[in-house]
Design a protein with these regions (language model features):
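Conserved AMP-binding/adenylate-forming
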Residues: 126-199
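Active-site phosphate/ATP/adenylate-binding loop shared across adenylate-forming ligases
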Residues: 1-138, 144, 161-163
């Protein structure tokens, strides 16, 4: 079908910035960090503008490098010296492969953490999946997981315990309901129902 277009007001953008700044802070990042974004702000990609706005609200530095361009990404890492990358994890595997093939000392780069978007990095039991292991076994960086959707205009974020993602209670109310609309008991399967707040 046709993609849905969701327009954003200035209030919506402020809400996105608040969500991402709070999420990044809870992940352990602060104004001393420098972020390199390996994702787009174009083509109505809400995550791009959300992360960018949130990083600015956090008071950190940011370079918007866009997706792709492996050579350019490594040049930017060498020149800007970011502490955090925001990227799709499968692209990080390509960065590592290129670095190894071109004798780039990526293990001693400035990058300490990667905020992973768009693909899972954990199994159902919260252990690292194959993709995450492939990255961390080669590059000793900390991986942080996020999950978001345009419709809820909010992201779930992973704290340092790596036992699942959290939401910002001021912006989102999350329920897991059965077929009759009642909350399920712990461990039961249900439908996730999201109520956005402040939209």
């Amino acid at each position: 079908g046709e993609p849905i277009t969701i327009t954003l007001s200035s209030s919506d953008l402020k809400r996105l910035a608040t969500n991402e700044a709070t999420s990044l802070s809870k992940m352990g990042f602060d104004s001393s960090d420098t972020f390199q974004m390996l994702l787009t702000l174009d083509r109505q990609f809400m995550a791009g503008i959300a992360y960018y706005s949130g990083i600015l609200k956090l008071g950190a530095s940011v370079v918007r490098n866009g997706p792709g361009g492996i050579v350019n990404q490594w040049k930017s890492i060498d020149k800007i010296r970011p502490t955090v990358l925001i990227a799709v994890p499968s692209f990080i595997s390509k960065l590592i492969k290129y670095a190894e093939e071109n004798e780039i000392d990526y293990k001693n780069s400035s990058v300490k953490s990667i905020v992973c978007i768009g693909e899972p990095i954990h199994n159902a039991d919260f252990s690292q999946n194959i993709l995450a292991k492939r990255i961390t076994e080669k590059w000793g960086v900390r991986l942080c997981s996020t999950y978001a959707s345009t419709e809820m205009a909010t992201a779930f974020y992973q704290c340092g315990k790596n036992k699942g993602c959290h939401n910002n209670d001021d912006l989102l109310f999350t329920e897991i309901l059965n077929d009759f609309g009642n909350p399920v008991s712990h461990g039961e399967t249900g439908e996730i129902v999201i109520t956005t707040l402040g939209v």
